[in-house]
């Protein structure tokens, strides 16, 4: 497997081609329905050096990725955080490379000065892998969904 840490805009087209299939492959879906990424914001963040992706390739084929938006913690000046906005592993590679993807992500993020990586997930299997990678449940996420959610593609 070949791991790399690249700006989002360098792999955006590749991720876009596979996004619908990735959504279909995921067992647990969120309440929002099919993805409708804000590509402009992702690309702007990427060009500003604030959105990066750890990729996993089997030769040339993209078989996994983990995307992070990187920012300064507004309550603790000088603390750089990386929020995971998406993690995906091709079905045939699950259970084989996910833990290594998490560990490689940690290495790459530490190398650019990130102090804390944050994953917000609704999948206990990935949570179990994060625990194996020395993550701990640290923050409680509370959510209040107002009325029904209906989005229109823009």
Which residues are covered by each model-predicted region?
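A short, internal acetyl-CoA/4′-phosphopantetheine-binding micro-motif in the GNAT/acyltransferase core
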Residues: 83-95
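Conserved acetyl-CoA-binding loop-helix of GNAT-fold acetyltransferases
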Residues: 94-107
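A short beta-loop-alpha structural element at the N-terminal edge
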Residues: 1-19
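A short helix-loop-beta-strand connector motif used in the catalytic cores of GNAT acetyltransferases and
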Residues: 43-55
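Conserved beta-strand in the GNAT
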Residues: 55, 61-70
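Conserved GNAT acetyl-CoA-binding A-motif
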Residues: 110-121
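Conserved active-site alpha-helix within GNAT-family acetyltransferase domains
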Residues: 121-140, 150-152
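Conserved GNAT-fold acetyl-CoA-binding loop/helix
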Residues: 23-42
């Amino acid at each position: 497997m070949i791991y790399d840490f690249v700006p989002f805009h360098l792999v955006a087209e590749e991720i876009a081609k596979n996004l619908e299939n990735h959504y279909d492959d995921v067992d647990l879906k969120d309440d929002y329905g099919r993805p409708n990424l804000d590509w402009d914001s992702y690309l702007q963040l990427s060009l500003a050096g604030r959105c990066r992706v750890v990729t996993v390739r089997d030769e040339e084929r993209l078989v996994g990725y983990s995307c992070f938006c990187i920012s300064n913690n507004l309550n603790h000046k000088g603390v750089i955080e990386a929020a995971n906005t998406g993690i995906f592993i091709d079905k045939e590679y699950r259970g084989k490379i996910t833990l290594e993807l998490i560990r490689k992500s940690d290495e790459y993020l530490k190398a650019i000065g990130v102090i804390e990586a944050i994953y917000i997930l609704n999948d206990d299997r990935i949570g179990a892998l994060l625990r194996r990678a020395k993550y701990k449940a640290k923050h409680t996420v509370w959510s209040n969904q107002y009325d029904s959610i209906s989005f229109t593609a823009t």
